[in-house]
């Protein structure tokens, strides 16, 4: 009844006035009307009077960087396999040209990417496995190998309530060849081509709304080539300066979210050409009479070409579209890699490795451990 209602207030502002850059501006009011014509105003109507001012900014919760950041973690998954198969092609493996190796390893891939340039960052954690085989094909052909793997992980938004579960399946072809320069020096050439497909399942929770979910696929290609020169020194030490080229190309499907304030995401792409250049220090000792090889390589990594993923995002609920973009990591970074292997007997060996890459205040980690059998 009239007099029982004081007025309408917005849940967003706590007053009748709505003045927010992320929403349409205006004022709420109310009135009582005589709906049945009996002369008594018994129906309450809420009235919205818009100012006609358009929305000037997109609510940061709606922008959707987590979806586009998925291409970064897909690329990292591909590098977890592609980089590890190259690390297997060390001087000792390439010198054993006629051996056939079957191997398996566990993989770990982790990223702590801070928000940067107004774009939301992410934290990624993933684990999985890979298996492979390689064999020598004569003195002039080097060693060829093939590998398959799978990584399962999830990425979390740094600033909002979003989580993306990722399942990546990968395959890699790799090759390496050793060329003797002298009794104490040799050149190594190696490369790999890795393909990965990632299935994404993202859940977003926007303030005041039920959760929305979106599913889509990413496809990633990674091509790597490396040249290095190893020289032997006194005390069993080896020094290996190296130059590597890494080209990554990723593609993300368009998709539509379901539930909540579901959004429409356009397809996006990632391109990056990186050149790591550095030095590897290694030596081989004995542990309980068994050969034990260790190496540490450090390098500067620079991106000479890069297209950060971006695409159009549309919200049917607000009838608005905008350009969404992934976070842009620093172009320059430092990478450190440690690898070790122990020859258990004539047939069996175990190995492991750890890689750390720092770009500004963001960190990327990869670990691996496995076993190989020679035939």
Which residues does each PLM region occupy?
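Extracellular/periplasm-exposed beta-strand and loop segments of Gram-negative cell-envelope proteins
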Residues: 112-114, 120-122, 153-166, 197-221, ...
């Amino acid at each position: 009844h009239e007099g029982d209602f004081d007025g309408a207030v917005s849940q967003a502002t706590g007053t009748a006035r709505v003045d927010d850059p992320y929403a349409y501006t205006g004022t709420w009011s109310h009135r009582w009307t005589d709906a049945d014509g009996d002369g008594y105003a018994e129906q309450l109507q809420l009235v919205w009077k818009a100012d006609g001012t358009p929305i000037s900014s997109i609510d940061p919760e709606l922008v959707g960087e987590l979806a586009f950041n998925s291409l970064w973690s897909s690329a990292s998954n591909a590098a977890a396999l592609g980089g590890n198969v190259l690390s297997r092609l060390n001087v000792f493996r390439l010198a054993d040209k006629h051996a056939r190796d079957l191997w398996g390893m566990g993989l770990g891939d982790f990223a702590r990417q801070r928000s940067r340039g107004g774009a939301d960052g992410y934290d990624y954690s993933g684990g999985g496995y890979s298996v492979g085989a390689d064999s020598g094909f004569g003195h002039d052909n080097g060693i060829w190998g093939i590998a398959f793997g799978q990584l399962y992980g999830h990425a979390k938004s740094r600033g909002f309530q979003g989580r993306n579960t990722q399942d990546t399946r990968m395959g890699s072809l790799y090759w390496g060849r050793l060329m003797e320069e002298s009794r104490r020096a040799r050149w190594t050439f190696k490369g790999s081509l890795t393909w990965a497909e990632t299935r994404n399942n993202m859940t977003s929770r926007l303030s005041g709304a039920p959760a929305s979910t979106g599913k889509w696929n990413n496809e990633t290609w990674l091509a790597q080539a490396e040249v290095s020169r190893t020289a032997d020194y006194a005390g069993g030490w080896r020094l290996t300066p190296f130059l590597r080229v890494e080209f990554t190309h990723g593609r993300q499907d368009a998709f539509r979210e379901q539930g909540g304030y579901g959004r429409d995401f356009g397809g996006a792409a990632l391109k990056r050409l990186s050149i790591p250049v550095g030095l590897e220090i290694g030596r081989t000792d004995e542990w309980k009479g068994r050969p034990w090889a260790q190496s540490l390589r450090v390098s500067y990594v620079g991106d000479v070409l890069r297209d950060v993923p971006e695409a159009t995002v549309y919200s049917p609920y607000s009838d608005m579209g905008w350009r969404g973009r992934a976070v842009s990591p620093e172009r320059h970074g430092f990478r450190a890699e440690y690898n070790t292997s122990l020859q258990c007997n004539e047939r069996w060996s175990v190995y492991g490795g750890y890689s750390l890459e720092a770009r500004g205040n963001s960190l990327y980690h990869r670990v691996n451990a496995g076993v190989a059998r020679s035939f």
